[in-house]
């Protein structure tokens, strides 16, 4: 699974792209995941979940 991070420039409800797993093959899926994810705080870490 790709790991997402929260961007400081963006709102907390949005997530950044995964670091090394967005390329030609999965651009559309990455964008779709990016739109349908939220950043949540759990156990003092920022993770993204689909909602």
Swiss-Prot record:
It holds the Pfam family Protamine_P1. Keywords: Chromosome, Developmental protein, Differentiation, DNA condensation, DNA-binding, Nucleosome core, Nucleus, Spermatogenesis. It comes from the Eukaryota. It is found in: Nucleus; Chromosome. InterPro entries: Protamine_P1 (IPR000221). The keyword Nucleus applies. One of its GO terms (cellular component) is nucleosome. GO terms for biological process: chromosome condensation; sperm DNA condensation. Its main location: nucleus. One of its GO terms (molecular function) is DNA binding. The keyword Amino-acid biosynthesis does not apply. Testis. Protamines substitute for histones in the chromatin of sperm during the haploid phase of spermatogenesis. They compact sperm DNA into a highly condensed, stable and inactive complex. Belongs to the protamine P1 family. This is Sperm protamine P1. It comes from Trachypithecus geei (Golden langur). The lineage of its organism: Eukaryota, Metazoa, Chordata, Craniata, Vertebrata.
């Amino acid at each position: 699974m790709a790991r997402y991070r929260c961007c400081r420039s963006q709102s907390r409800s949005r997530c950044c792209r995964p670091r090394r797993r967005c390329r030609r093959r999965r651009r559309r899926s990455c964008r779709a995941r990016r739109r349908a994810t939220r950043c949540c705080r759990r156990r003092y870490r920022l993770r993204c979940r689909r909602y």
